[in-house]
Amino acid sequence: MITRVRSELTRYLRTETVGGAILLVAAAIALLWVNSPWGDSYLRMTETVLAIEPLHLELTLADWTKDGLLAVFFFVAGLELKRELVVGELADPKRAALPIIAAVGGVVTPALIAAVIGHGAPGMDKGWAIPVATDIAFALGVLALTGSRIPATARVFLLSLAVVDDLLAIILIAVLFTVGVSLLWLLAAAACMAGWWLAQRRRLRTPLVYVPLALVTWYALHEAGVHPTLAGVALGLLTRVRPDPDEEWAPAARLEHLIQPVSAGICVPLFALFAAGVPLNATVFGELFTDRLALAVMLGLLLGKTIGIFGISWVAIRFGLATRPSGLGYRDMFALSVLGAIGFTVSLLVAELALPDGDTVELAKAAVLITSLAASLAGSALLLRRGRVHQARQDALELQPDEGDASDPSEGGSLR
């Protein structure tokens, strides 16, 4: 009975709609809790220190979720990236061109907009990086919920885009927030990564090898002064993707199947619970539209991501640098670009890393939350509308199969 319940639960957690919904519920609980009469208890909880004395680790619960649990999320992201690079959409240079170009546009444009608008504001020396990332789980969850009538190539494009986007964000985290690196600990982390790679080559399958290697890699990077979530990405990229003839599943697919429900159902929601608790009042809402940092984050996400992803994609297609995904019109791609403005998880992480002042962090988080909500609502509305268009076209084809394909204007080269 317990096994069956656990099996059903993990099956549900693997669906993008459920994962996105749990993430949203966790963020809503945090917001309601911190803005309730019991808000002080929320703050006390997040600031509670949990120490592992022999290892000299003293982190608050909020830091454990940020540095520890998100490493699991980034491990899954690393597995997804490796799969896409080796056997997925990014393995074919022709198909990979568009999501890669779109991801670059979706990182550079928000950063430029944020840097210009927030120039001179406290924290903007690194705060320009806050709006550069797309939340994979949230964006795919919204697409699964509202874009069921959109061609399947939409999910492939958005997933590939978000994976490359997250890779670029991870590189920024490594470059911007690595200070005072300890070479000895960095070498220790590299040795553990080499051990993981060697175990993969030797076809070792026991968790008694991989779990200690993962934990020591995380600890070594933490002690080295490198953000420890990068351990997850590195180990994910070092995991074998192609199965042997005697294997039903490759190690990467097996690990993703096992760990993705834990990431979606526990790790990311707990991070959201501890990170999304932002006091919202009239003062905060007023500052959102007057403070340069808040405006930089909001416009960087909502305008920068949308313009960057869609604009650079349109240019690449028009000039023959990439091809448009089969079945998708420019209006479909615009709707997907709006979903790219859902920053959430990684944007909240970067806000905590980039901004030293508590009040500034809370304001930036509020900007991320408000903008991510706006992007999800706007993207949902656009996807629902596009879904009706695709459904109407399909119905027309079924009723009049001999009259040809009544094409949608957005499917051609026009933006109409």
Curated annotation (Swiss-Prot):
Superkingdom as given in the UniProt entry: Bacteria
Lineage, uppermost ranks: Bacteria, Bacillati, Actinomycetota, Actinomycetes, Mycobacteriales
Catalytic function, reaction form: Na(+)(in) + 2 H(+)(out) = Na(+)(out) + 2 H(+)(in)
Chain's gene name: nhaA
One GO cellular component term noted in the UniProt record for this chain: plasma membrane
Protein's UniProt keywords contain Nucleotidyltransferase: no
The keyword Glycosyltransferase appears for this protein: no
One of the protein's GO biological processes: regulation of pH
Membrane topology according to the record: Multi-pass membrane protein
One Gene Ontology MF term: sodium:proton antiporter activity
Role according to the record: Na(+)/H(+) antiporter that extrudes sodium in exchange for external protons.
Record InterPro entries: Na/H_antiporter_dom_sf, NhaA
Compartments reported by the entry: Cell membrane
NCBIfam families in UniProt: NhaA
Protein name as annotated: Na(+)/H(+) antiporter NhaA
Disordered: annotated segments: 396-416
Membership in a protein family: Belongs to the NhaA Na(+)/H(+) (TC 2.A.33) antiporter family.
Keywords: Antiport, Cell membrane, Ion transport, Membrane, Sodium, Sodium transport, Transmembrane, Transmembrane helix, Transport
Annotated TM spans: 18-38, 59-79, 97-117, 127-147, 167-187, 265-285, 297-317, 333-353, 363-383
